[in-house]
Amino acid sequence: MSNHDPISDMLTRIRNASQKKHTSTAIPASKMSLSIAKVLQKEGFITDINEEGEGYKSQIVLGLKYSGKNKFPTIRSMQRVSKPGLRVYKNTKGLPKVLGGLGVAIVSTSKGVMSDRDARKQGIGGEVLCYVY
């Protein structure tokens, strides 16, 4: 079955794996998925990123992060904002602060995929891909 929205698929795989308390999850590899994973790692939501396989069978394995002795997932929610049917673009001033700054909006800009904080520092806007908190 073809996947029309790989970003939503990635977010769903991460959300499902963290709810089941898996230590890692595999997602189909793409440049966009790898960029989003790097932002998640930089912001402290995942532990590590490993690329496996070659060509169209390549995958990205993400190490999921948990806190406390009950292993509560660090990622509480992931919401897709800009969808294939309705793209959402924001300028620097319009970039949202997720949960008053506790969460992260992942933004695709002309200078690459980055968090909303980094985009504000650089003074650029872009397509708001998702919210993570």
UniProtKB/Swiss-Prot annotation:
Entries under Pfam families matching the protein: Ribosomal_S8
GO cellular component: ribonucleoprotein complex; ribosome
Domain of life: Bacteria
Keyword Signal on entry: no
Gene Ontology BP terms: translation
Record keywords, A-Z: Ribonucleoprotein, Ribosomal protein, RNA-binding, rRNA-binding
Single GO molecular function: rRNA binding
InterPro entries in the record: Ribosomal_uS8 (IPR000630), Ribosomal_uS8_CS (IPR047863), Ribosomal_uS8_sf (IPR035987)
Family: Belongs to the universal ribosomal protein uS8 family.
NCBIfam families: PRK00136.1
Record text on subunit structure and interactions: Part of the 30S ribosomal subunit. Contacts proteins S5 and S12.
Main function: One of the primary rRNA binding proteins, it binds directly to 16S rRNA central domain where it helps coordinate assembly of the platform of the 30S subunit.
Name the record gives this protein: Small ribosomal subunit protein uS8
